[in-house]
Curated annotation (Swiss-Prot):
Identification of the protein by name: Universal stress protein Rv2026c
Record-stated family: Belongs to the universal stress protein A family.
InterPro entries: Rossmann-like_a/b/a_fold, Universal_stress_UspA, USP_A, UspA
Induction: Constitutively expressed during exponential phase, normoxic and hypoxic stationary phase.
PANTHER family xref list: UNIVERSAL STRESS PROTEIN SLR1230, USPA DOMAIN-CONTAINING PROTEIN
Disrupted gene: phenotype observed: No visible phenotype under normal or hypoxic and normoxic stationary phase growth.
Pfam family, one: Usp
Gene Ontology molecular function terms on file: ATP binding
Record's miscellaneous remark: Was identified as a high-confidence drug target.
Keywords for the protein's UniProt record, in alphabetical order: ATP-binding, Nucleotide-binding
Lineage per the UniProt record: Bacteria, Bacillati, Actinomycetota, Actinomycetes, Mycobacteriales
Binding site for ATP 2: G164, D197, G261, S262, H263, G264, R265, G266, G267, S275, V276, S277
Amino acid sequence: MSAATAKYGILVGVDGSAQSNAAVAWAAREAVMRQLPITLLHIVAPVVVGWPVGQLYANMTEWQKDNAQQVIEQAREALTNSLGESKPPQVHTELVFSNVVPTLIDASQQAWLMVVGSQGMGALGRLLLGSISTALLHHARCPVAIIHSGNGATPDSDAPVLVGIDGSPASEAATALAFDEASRRRVDLVALHAWTDLGMFPVLGMDWREREKREAEVLAERLAGWQEQYPDVRVHRSLVCDKPARWLLEHSEQAQLVVVGSHGRGGFSGMLLGSVSSAVAHSVRIPVIVVRPS
């Protein structure tokens, strides 16, 4: 979905945790940078009881509503504090009483980007947001940004954007977004192509030098069109014969943002980047955007 037609613009799942507030702050800066509306969405799982409880049920429901309003207000405050005098075009808030994961996945169909904290407390403290973010990585219909508390780069950071490239459709979509992010942030782009998931061990019968030459050509071809479209972005290529997740984690220590595809192939056909994206999203300490193919 294009940014212009996305109802929610940048959609942030909020729950009152420190990670949630960090997600709001990051999303707010992204909304200002892109001039997109931002929507703060808090979902409360309905109270489920196995027997009539009368006033107890009513009290619990009322407590949920009061607590939910506090979460929304806290998210608004986090947004305001993160921006200073800057403001996104529009700020919307939504409070929904429903099951958390299905509601977020459904809402993602109308968002340009969904942003969530890496971990936090779900409805009534029963559901870790870590499990929610994992579900979104696999099922959301838009790119998903995973934000860790207190470890994101500062808004004026000159650290590069890091993108993982493997040649899959999801990787191509990730490359497009990574170039755009680097251009808007006015920073360099590091393009990492790790072309095997077997580790740095020789395989009998394979000409590794010839394979490396071919993989370097593939990486150059994948980047050529985007470098023409974004001549302002300086690109650093990194080609390694090793596991993608390992090198993405290592390179992320000098980056401000990591962008990867949701699914693709690893070094060989059939090795899904899905496992790589999940590992990176939950291990890297900087913001990670996981992109689905268009």
